[in-house]
Swiss-Prot record:
It comes from Rhodospirillum centenum (strain ATCC 51521 / SW). This is Ribosome maturation factor RimP. SUPFAM superfamilies: YhbC-like, C-terminal domain (SSF74942), YhbC-like, N-terminal domain (SSF75420). GO terms for cellular component: cytosol. It holds the Pfam family RimP_N.
């Protein structure tokens, strides 16, 4: 976690100066870890492969100088996608009304996992409207409904509105729903790829060191055999660098 936070501090000023915003920095893997940089455009436009490539080059240059990760690693730059993670407080306000899943570091109202509709923010806390409970057939689960968010805003007793301090949020992500797809298509003209999709650039930021390969030994020249004819002289190297077989060379 310390390495991730340090990397974020190193690259964020340059990324923002280029017209982008950091969404998430994540490090995964073992001996050769993958450093994932997730970013979006500050102007709200859709990310392109060229955007990801520009960020990748800038980040690579910074990390080569600062060297926050020992050894070899793979750098991956991607766009958030539609079913994006919610990592900043403003994300919960921006996507108010859409369905999301959320997990907390400690129990809130006796639970750690929530699924409901984002209802904005309150100071430094996230407001989440849980589904309106409706009678269902025996054995069937009640599906979330967008009415929960509307009811939560209106203070309807049927909706359960939970307020979660942002500092307790472990991870959160939008649910891929028809409403979200429609909104994304209307905003950008066409639905972009989901998280980890086409808007992604990978490169070996620090290639692994290749094992040393010993140089091939040059074959030694052989002298004339015991029974070579007089005047045969020395063997001459062949065109391929190896010794040419003379008429009096002794077979081995």
């Amino acid at each position: 976690m310390e390495a991730v936070e340090r990397i974020g501090r190193i690259i964020e000023p340059s990324v923002e100066a280029m017209g982008y915003e950091l969404v998430r920095v994540q490090l995964s893997g073992g001996q050769r870890p993958t450093l994932q940089i997730m970013a979006e455009r500050s102007d709200g436009a859709a990310m392109t492969v060229e955007d990801c490539a520009d960020i990748s080059r800038a980040v690579s240059a910074l990390l080569d100088v600062e060297d926050p990760l020992p050894g070899a690693y793979t750098l991956e730059v991607s766009s958030p996608g539609i079913d994006r993670p919610l990592t900043r407080l403003k994300d919960f306000e921006r996507f108010a009304g859409f369905e999301a899943r959320l997990e907390t570091k400690a129990p809130v109202d006796g639970r750690k996992r929530f699924r409901g509709f984002l209802a904005g923010i309150e100071d430094d806390a996230v407001r989440l409207a849980l589904p309106v409970e409706k009678k269902a057939r025996k054995g069937a689960k009640a599906a979330p409904t967008r009415d929960a968010a509307d009811a939560g805003e209106a203070g309807d007793a049927e909706a359960t509105l939970v307020v979660i301090p942002f500092g307790l949020v472990l991870k959160a992500k939008l649910e891929l729903t028809d409403e979200l797809l429609t909104a994304a298509a209307a905003e950008q003209g066409a639905a972009p790829g989901t998280e980890g999709g086409a808007m992604e650039v990978e490169e070996d930021a620090r290639p692994a060191r290749r094992p040393h390969q010993p140089k091939p030994k040059k074959a030694k020249k052989k002298g004339p055999g015991r029974f070579s004819k007089a005047g045969a002289g020395e063997d001459v190297d062949g065109a391929d660098g190896g010794p040419a077989a003379g008429p009096g060379a002794q077979d081995e």
